[in-house]
Amino acid sequence: ESHTMTGFARRAAAGLLAAVFGISMLAGCTPNNAAVGDTQSAGDAVAHSMKDRNSLDVAMIGSQDEQTDRLALDAMEAGGLRPVYLPVAGTVDMQDTARQAVEDMAQRMVSIIVISGIDVSGVNHDGWYDTLTTARQAGIPVALLNPIATPTDSALFAATLTINDRMTDATPFADAVAGIANNDPHDRTILVTTISHGGKQ
């Protein structure tokens, strides 16, 4: 008899989870067991108001590689986004500066946070977990651009974006960022290009 009970309880729990998941996605809250902005199939996508790109608040947290940061910023602007850039190069502890910037942007309730060159390892590990959890609880999707080391907890970020400008079929950077911000279906790992459609760099 206990066997049937478990089966029933499991089904009930699954149903409850589905209901909670559905409601939380609609409310724009934190989804269960998945990153904010991590919709991988069209079936999971909840109807959302497609914000105009220029009304998306995109925060980009810099890295020590300012050249790559600049390419990414230019590509976002070329694609109709208006990113706010928070540089960290030249600061005493760049990962710590980046974490502070993420927490500031989470408080400002931006649409998406793009973190360049994140290194979730060693002394930075626990601090990054706390910071990314703060963004998650605020319901803000996080995309990791050219990460050095990512968190093992995949619920803490929506996707990694790796720039590959030699790939002709890579996703335009602005499209990837806008898609994640709007919770469109996307892969966990996205190869992006900073070269605009016009063929000019």
Model regions and ranges:
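N-terminal export and membrane-targeting signals
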Residues: 1-19
